[in-house]
Amino acid sequence: LRYIEMDSPIAFRGLEDLSGTAVLVERLGEKMYRELVERRAAAIITIASNKWYQADADLLPTEMRPNYLKWGALPTFTVRPYDAAAMLRDGAATLRLELRQRSYTATSHNVVAVVEGTEPTDEWVAVTAHYDSTSITPGAWDNGSGTAAVMGLYRHFLNHPPRRNMRFIWCGSEEQGLLGSRAYVRAHQELLPSCRMCFNFDMCGSILGNNEISFIGPAALETMVRQVCDEAGFPSNVDAYVDSSDSAPFACAGVPVVCPSRGHWTSQEMHTRHDTLDTISPQKLHEMVAFSTALIGFFVNAPDFPIAREIPADAAATLEKRFGPAVP
C-alpha cells in the first residue's frame, strides 16, 4: 500500500513502476488516474470525502467515467476517511482486495419544455437543472431543489410569455459526468448559435447557508446580476468561476451562464442518506424562484439582449481543461 497525496511530479518521483502496489489517493482526478495507469498500479483506493470523518459515513459506488477509461482500466475501490486514516496510522503495508462489480447499459432521458417568445426571433435562453441523484441518497437538496426551482420558473414564464424563446431542460445523469447536458449540447449544435444564455440551478433552498451566484461571461454580466440582486433585495455572493454542473457544456460551447444556488459547509449532506426534505426551507426556495424570475426576466424581456454571447479567454481555457472540447 502506498499513499500518494496529490498528482504532482514531486509526489511521483521515484515511482515509475507501481506494479503490485495498491495506491491510496486523496482525490482521483483524471490526471492522477492517468499517472497510475501509466505507472501500472495494481489498484486504486479512493477516499470517500475529506468532509466526512465518521466511521459510518456513506460510501458511494465507484463509477468510472469514459474520459478516465480511455487511459485504461484499473480496479478501483472507495473507503471512508476514518478507515483510510486507520490504515496509514497503523502502518498497513499489505492488502488483500476483492473486487465485485457489474457492468450494464442504461438509458437516461432529458425532459425538455419550450416556451415560445412573443416576438419573432431565433434567440433563446436555456434554464437547466439535473433531476437525478446518486444511488444512496434521497436527493432533496441535490438536486430535487433545483428541479423544483426550474418547474416554478417554467410555470411563471408559461403564464407570462417572455419576448424571447425559452427552453427548460431537466437533465439526466448529471452525477455520472454531466451526461444529460453534454448529450443535449451535442445533439443541438444547430441551435446553439442562437442560445444567448444558460441559467442553471443545482442545490437551492437549504435552511442553513447563504445564496451564491456563479457566472461565466462578459464583464458586464456581473454588473447586471448585482443590479438585479440589489433591486430585488436578494443578498448573495456573486463570483466568476467554473462550476461542475449542467451549465458547463453550454459554457464550453460559448454560451454565458449564470448559476444561482444556496448552501453552506454546515449543510454538506449531498450524496448521503441525510439529504432529505427536512434540510430544505420552502420559504428560501420560494425566495430563490422569485429572485430568479426577476433575474431571467431582465434578460429574456430586454428589447436588445443586454450582453454579448462570449466567454472570456481565461475562463474558456479553464473550461477546456476541466471538461474537454466545445462539443463534449
Model-predicted segments: where are they?
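Structural recognition of the beta-strand scaffold that forms the well-ordered cores
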Residues: 3, 22-25, 43-46, 76-78, ...
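Soluble non-cytosolic domains of exported or imported proteins
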Residues: 26-31, 78, 140-148, 160, ...
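Soluble metallo-hydrolase cores and metallopeptidase-like ectodomains found primarily
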Residues: 1-10, 62-140, 152-155, 159, ...
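Second-shell loop/turn segments in exported
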Residues: 3, 20-27, 32, 72-74, ...
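Metal-dependent peptidase/peptidase-like ectodomains
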Residues: 76, 135, 162, 171-269
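Extracellular/luminal Protease-associated
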Residues: 1-75, 236
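His/Asp/Glu-rich mid-to-C-terminal helical/loop segments that flank catalytic regions of hydrolases
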Residues: 155, 267-328
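Solvent-exposed loop/turn segments at secondary-structure junctions
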Residues: 28-31, 49-53, 83-84, 102-105, ...
